[in-house]
Amino acid sequence: MQAVHDEFANELAFILVNDDIGHNAGLMINPGMFREIFPHRMKRLIAPAKAKNKLVAYHTDGKMDKIFPILDDVGFDIVHPIEPESNDIFAVKEKWGERFALVGNIPTVLLAYGSIDEIDERVKLYCEKMGPGGGYVLGSSTSIMEGIPPQNFVAMTRAAHKYGRYGSLGKA
């Protein structure tokens, strides 16, 4: 990590650690074991970025409630993607919104099968509820995959521009 950071630090806005450890019902590792092993190793991994005051994001799919305190202790700044099938992003924002920037949560099922109006309404809701106080980056709950109609992705993006401006909600 140090070599990568030394080479690219000035060009990067943040560092993303992609480490899927969860599924819809919980962690794929015993929480006690996770707490014992993860913090020390992750602190060492992200130390070069933190030394240069870079933001560090953590990505994992699945239910995250048990790991937020650990992510906080390690020093992560951003959490991605807060899957809606496993996490109530509004409750996460209430509890952890002062500590982390939150990314994602627009269901890929909605993007795959929803109407443009349904997508627009969901984005509006998220911008209204997640926007106050900042710290939210609208995005999908996982990767934009094959099978998501391009027009639905465009609808999400347009709605984000329409509703997602801090301080000017709905005034594009």
Short names for language-model regions:
Residues 1-172:
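Active-site loop segments of alpha/beta catalytic cores
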